[in-house]
């Protein structure tokens, strides 16, 4: 399964309400077959500009990152689901790049005589 990062901006709320929104979001991800690896709180701060969402203007928001693995079909369904959640201001899925690891071919022995500089006679 591909690995994704879900970036969320939640409206400014008290800690219990924020925890409820995150729990709801993580449960929705797991219902759709995702494996949640990590949830990171980046803190609450002022938004770079006023964002209007669900008939409200937001000036502050809580930033969160969810690290997950899931099927490719999860992106469109979760974007639709999160777009309808009134507590989420912005959401974005970022796909992790697939890193290819190169196998080590080992150390090639070098002839010491080839490294010696011939002396001038």
Curated annotation (Swiss-Prot):
Main location per the UniProt record: mitochondrion
GO molecular function annotation: small ribosomal subunit rRNA binding; structural constituent of ribosome
SUPFAM superfamilies hit by this protein: Ribosomal protein S6 (SSF54995)
InterPro entries: Ribosomal_bS6 (IPR000529), Ribosomal_bS6_sf (IPR035980), Transl_elong_EF1B/ribsomal_bS6 (IPR014717)
GO BP annotations, alphabetical order: translation
Subcellular location as annotated: Mitochondrion
Domain of life: Eukaryota
Gene Ontology CC terms, in alphabetical order: mitochondrial small ribosomal subunit
Entry keyword Ribosomal protein: yes
Keywords: Mitochondrion, Ribonucleoprotein, Ribosomal protein
Subunit architecture: Component of the mitochondrial ribosome small subunit (28S) which comprises a 12S rRNA and about 30 distinct proteins.
PANTHER family per record: MITOCHONDRIAL 28S RIBOSOMAL PROTEIN S6, SMALL RIBOSOMAL SUBUNIT PROTEIN BS6M
Family label: Belongs to the bacterial ribosomal protein bS6 family.
Protein name: Small ribosomal subunit protein bS6m
The species this protein was found in: Gallus gallus (Chicken)
């Amino acid at each position: 399964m591909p690995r994704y990062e879900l970036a969320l901006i939640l409206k400014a709320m008290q800690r219990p309400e924020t925890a409820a929104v995150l729990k709801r979001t993580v449960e929705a991800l797991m219902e759709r077959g995702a494996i949640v690896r990590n949830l990171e709180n980046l803190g609450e701060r002022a938004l770079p500009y006023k964002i209007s969402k669900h008939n409200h203007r937001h000036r502050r928001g809580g930033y969160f990152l969810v690290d997950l693995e899931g099927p490719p079909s999860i992106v469109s369904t979760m974007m639709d689901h999160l777009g309808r959640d009134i507590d989420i201001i912005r959401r974005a899925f970022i796909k992790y790049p697939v890193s290819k690891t190169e196998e080590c071919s080992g150390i090639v022995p070098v002839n010491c005589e080839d490294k010696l500089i011939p002396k001038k006679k």
